[in-house]
Amino acid sequence: MTLPGIPVDVHRALVAHLLEHSVRTGDFTLKSGRRSSWFIDSKQTACDPDGVLLMAGAALAVIPDDATAIGGLTVGADPVAYGVAAVAATRGRRLRSFTIRKEAKDHGVTGRLAGPLRAGDRVAITEDTVTRGTSLFEAVEVVRELGAEPVLIMPLVDRGGTCAAMAAEAGIAYRPLVTAPD
């Protein structure tokens, strides 16, 4: 699948927002266990009103028109999915957002899914920041188990790990909104 590009002005503004609000320098241990001299707290962009608009503008430029839902593993996917779905609605596009719990609930509405994902949905799987892609691919597995089809893997930021190769191996289009070199 060929994905459309993000408008240059939107991409530049999103990168500038991330650099100003989300990038930190220092000595950090990443979720992957790797050490890094920089860290992206991308929720500082994904949860900021201006950041949401920039993120959603970029995302809606690359999410296939036939996608019907957006979501991923909580907590990383939540602000991305909810923000993109809300902005999509203001533009006349319907994308249902959902989240996948890390563990199934044993009370109320049980299971790992929270939100209106349906069998047959064509899904954009998202995450705020990714290095190895384990959370994204856990979400892919759950979405498939629920009878929906992942059509795009779209992290807000790709730090440059193994996610692109894993997506290619799984046969799913991959388009981060921003990469570390950006």
Question: Can you say where each PLM-predicted feature lies in the sequence?
Answer:
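Short glycine-rich phosphate-binding loop at a beta-alpha junction
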Residues: 66-76, 152-154
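PRPP-dependent phosphoribosyltransferase catalytic core
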Residues: 2-17, 140-182
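Active-site-facing substrate-recognition patch
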Residues: 1-63
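Structural detector of well-ordered beta-strand residues that form the stable sheet scaffold
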Residues: 70-71, 98, 151, 175
